[in-house]
Regions:
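Ferredoxin-type iron-sulfur electron-transfer modules and their immediate structural context
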Residues: 1-133
């Protein structure tokens, strides 16, 4: 797997201001699969997992991000689901900048990996693609 050494996070698409001022939909639209894979490849998979120590629910962040980088979004969801039953909510409202992303090694000199954005993507992908009885 090739690493993406881009110093900045993949930008999150947002609604056009002229559209969003007429609705109550989310402003941030979320990543596409290609964007999520590209952002996940920014993770350098640190041996001591500082991002995981910053996660209050203990998600195995390097493992779920590794699955996203490989395009295995369902496996990523299963990793998150072991520790959190609300990944779509946490991916949107958890203060990642002071928790997991705040501990990300990439964030020392550049922008940290977009862990919350990836968690949101995985949860949304699961909701849209996995049909349970």
């Amino acid at each position: 797997m090739a690493f993406n050494m881009d110093p900045k996070k993949c930008p999150m698409p947002t609604q056009d201001p002229n559209v969003r001022n007429k609705n109550f939909e989310e402003v941030a639209l979320g990543y596409t699969a290609e964007m999520a894979v590209n952002e996940a490849k920014r993770c350098v998979h640190c041996k001591n997992k500082p991002c995981q120590t910053g996660c209050p629910v203990g998600i195995d962040i390097p493992e779920f991000i590794g699955h996203v980088a490989e395009g295995d979004f369902e496996a990523a969801y299963q990793v998150i689901n072991r520790s959190s039953s609300l990944p779509a909510v946490c991916g949107r409202v958890c203060p990642q900048e002071s928790q997991c992303e705040g501990k990300c090694t990439r964030g020392i000199k550049n922008e940290p990996v977009g862990i919350g954005r990836l968690e949101r993507f995985v949860a949304d992908w699961h909701r849209e693609n996995v049909h349970t009885a």
